[in-house]
């Protein structure tokens, strides 16, 4: 029977998705995230018992590695990557190593216990893939396998992206999802009525994970996933382009986004920490976009831009 080793990273909540990705890149086969915020306002809808958890901005991300992994080497690499993330302005922390060995079935039980269905927007609820869930009238359920490290859709940047997509889509649109990760924004776009969605990610792992999550959701055959470096080489025009990635990367795609967004179309940018906000705004304005909506949650910002000649309905118009 295969056994597993644990590596736990204690970081600020804002770094959740970036650090989870680092752990997968170093060979982790899955992660579990313990976040006190997950228990805020939880209700025992079906008789669940939720623990009394002290609230903190810090979270614990536990990664699981095969027993053959050299954890000393992995820890060095993780610390180097955390230092790089810190240079981007993300709040990170120190690595603690727990070399406890777990049987494979124990590992599965360990990480699954952290996840519950979560209502993200008015219409969208994210549900772990193994959970039976009875949706209410009008509720759109996104099935995700959060054990694949790209987040559960509950991070502030993802929440704001989902809210923006929900507000914009009316049905029949073409959507491009840049840096798709788990595929959650593409799945949401499909459920909200988009006609065709193109999902791109530079990471082959993300491409695979996104496709696996898409396959969990019925009626999402209109999502096309492919490896891609932002919008380079893309010629397909879109009504909406959405990107939830680091600000330093967002500024590299605004010109291509303007080229591809149809007139009266939208560009949704999220993943922007406050200190990088002006940089992203400048890049989008320089490309020709007008700002329509600015959302803020904690230190995170999401921006909705419009490609239009009629600026009466946009900020500053």
Curated annotation (Swiss-Prot):
Source organism superkingdom: Bacteria
Main enzyme class: transferase
Keywords noted in UniProt: Cytoplasm, Methyltransferase, S-adenosyl-L-methionine, Transferase
Keyword Secreted: no
Residues annotated as binding S-adenosyl-L-methionine: 158, 179, 201, 244
Catalytic reaction annotation: L-lysyl-[protein] + 3 S-adenosyl-L-methionine = N(6),N(6),N(6)-trimethyl-L-lysyl-[protein] + 3 S-adenosyl-L-homocysteine + 3 H(+)
GO biological process terms on file: methylation
Name this polypeptide is given: Ribosomal protein L11 methyltransferase
HAMAP family from the UniProt entry: Methyltr_PrmA
Described function: Methylates ribosomal protein L11.
Name of a matching Pfam family: PrmA
Keyword Isomerase among UniProt keywords: no
Chain's gene name: prmA
Species per Swiss-Prot/TrEMBL record: Streptococcus pyogenes serotype M4 (strain MGAS10750)
GO cellular component, one term: cytoplasm
Locations listed in the record: Cytoplasm
Family membership noted in the UniProt record: Belongs to the methyltransferase superfamily. PrmA family.
Enzyme Commission number: 2.1.1.-
GO MF: protein-lysine N-methyltransferase activity
């Amino acid at each position: 029977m295969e056994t597993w080793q644990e590596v736990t990273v204690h970081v600020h909540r804002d770094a959740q998705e970036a650090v989870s990705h680092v752990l997968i890149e170093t060979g982790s086969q899955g992660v579990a995230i313990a976040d006190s915020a997950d228990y805020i306002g939880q209700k025992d809808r079906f008789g669940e018992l939720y623990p009394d958890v002290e609230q903190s901005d810090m979270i614990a991300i536990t990664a699981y590695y095969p027993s053959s992994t050299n954890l000393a080497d992995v820890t060095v690499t993780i610390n180097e990557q955390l230092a790089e993330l810190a240079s981007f302005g993300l709040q990170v922390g120190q690595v603690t190593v727990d070399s406890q060995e777990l049987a494979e079935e124990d590992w599965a039980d360990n990480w699954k216990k952290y996840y519950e269905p979560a209502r993200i927007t008015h219409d969208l609820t994210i549900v772990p893939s193994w959970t039976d869930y009875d949706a209410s009238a009008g509720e759109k359920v996104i099935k995700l396998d959060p054990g694949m490290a790209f987040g559960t859709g509950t991070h502030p940047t993802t929440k704001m992206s989902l809210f923006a997509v929900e507000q914009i889509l009316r049905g029949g649109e073409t959507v491009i999802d840049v840096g798709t990760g788990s595929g959650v924004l593409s799945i949401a776009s499909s459920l909200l009525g988009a006609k065709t969605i193109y999902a791109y990610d530079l990471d082959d792992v993300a491409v695979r994970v996104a496709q696996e999550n898409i396959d969990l959701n019925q009626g999402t055959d209109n999502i096309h996933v492919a490896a891609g470096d932002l919008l380079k080489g893309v010629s397909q025009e879109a009504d909406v382009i959405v990107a939830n990635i680091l600000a330093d990367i967002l500024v590299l795609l605004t010109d291509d986004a303007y080229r591809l967004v149809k007139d009266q179309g939208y560009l949704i940018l999220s993943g922007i920490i406050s200190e990088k906000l002006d940089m992203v705004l400048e890049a989008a304005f320089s490309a020709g976009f007008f700002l329509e909506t600015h959302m803020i949650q904690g230190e995170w910002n999401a921006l909705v831009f419009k490609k239009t000649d009629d600026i009466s309905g946009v900020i500053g118009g």
